Amino acid sequence: MAAARYWKLVPRGRGLSQNAAAKASATAPEVRDLEVVATPVARYPPIVASMTADSKAARQRRVQRWQATVHAAPSVDEKIRILTKMQFKKYVVHPQISALNADRWYQSFTKTVFVSGLPPAPALSPPPPSLDLAALRAAVCDCILQEQVYVRRRRPRSLFDRRQALASSILDQVVRTLVNLLAPLNPVLSTAALDCKRSVDFYWLRGEERIPAGHRKGHIDALRYQINDKPHNQIRISKQLPEFVPLDYSIPTEIPVMKCKPDKLPLFRRQYENSIFTGSKTADPCCYGHTQFHLIPDRLKRERLIRQNQAEQVEAVFRANAIASLFAWTGAQAMYQGFWSEADVTRPFVSQAVITDGKYFSFFCYQLNTLALTVQADQNNPRKNLCWGSQSQPLYETVEDNDVKGFDDGTLLQIVHFLLNKPREDGAQLLASQEKELDLGP
């Protein structure tokens, strides 16, 4: 039986015949692996996805180029302009909303954990100064009685207008009076900026959705949110309030997870100018928040909710207002310092809030620990924003015969303690103040 035959292809060099090439190949020395010379690096540019293609790689490259543009922005104003210039439909978040359990939805939107009770005072905080409680109580009672007379003279057209005008004027006068009286005890208040009904806006991205219809059907798009808040009064200072807990403080409480879209709250989408605003321009030296004062509208007051068999929603209204308003305020402060979702904060941002319906007051403290709320930035981000809050308590019961009945000193003291909170002094300033106190001692 004949043996099987096969053909072997022999490479032929240029200018050689086939027989000559075969002889040259047979006589050539063997080349081992260690003698192979490394091939030079390719000099052509890397192959990347097209900027205009309809693919995941192309979309990722466009996002990376946009992020690089934000990182390279020369100023904070330019960075905010780039982050807010593209207008898409976004969910408009109202801090004062009548939806049931809105506070749980707002915790999910802002990655905030709510902690019942107020945080303890910082360990290195100085002892509280001695207060003349009787003088403070008399000043607040005078404000209440004075505004009662003025509102009665104006004679609003309806009972609703009268109650809103009375609560608004009382809150305005009480805040101004207490700030002036406490300025000698807290020098920060003497140089602070006191705003009245100033806008506070914040725009951010949180979560994703699949577009159900249209020419972009099936695409994955980010969920966008916008808060347009208007606190009744707010105090801005030039230095930052001290943190309540460390930046990476771990809390075991979980954030509520909402499996429905925000439309079910309900929240509605609108397309208009994106805005990030703390109440002042970026060049303002008073760029940090101290305390906000919010007035609950008449449609959300506890008497109306109790009549509608929604007594459990009374405190939820206060919590939702605090979470949304303080997140927007502290988030805007952080972005004024150059932080955003892809450049997360390196220090906490702290602010306080007092929320009232004219008679009942509730107190909240907020610490912003992260702005990385997008799906990509939040993948390995253990930080959570924290909100502490108290139950609402009355400042007074009623006004009868030009006398304030049932005045609660505890509520007044809590307002005073909020206003006396001040930035932490550095080591040199703290040592100088202690030496001054020793020199002025008995």
UniProtKB/Swiss-Prot annotation:
Coiled coil: none
UniProt-annotated location(s): Mitochondrion
Main location: mitochondrion
Self-association and partners: Component of the mitochondrial ribosome small subunit (28S) which comprises a 12S rRNA and about 30 distinct proteins.
Ribosomal protein found in the keyword field: yes
UniProt source species: Mus musculus (Mouse)
Family: Belongs to the mitochondrion-specific ribosomal protein mL65 family.
Pfam families membership: PDCD9
GO cellular component: mitochondrial inner membrane; mitochondrial large ribosomal subunit; mitochondrion
Descriptive protein name: Large ribosomal subunit protein mL65
Entry GO MF terms: structural constituent of ribosome
Keyword line: Mitochondrion, Ribonucleoprotein, Ribosomal protein
Biological process according to GO: mitochondrial translation
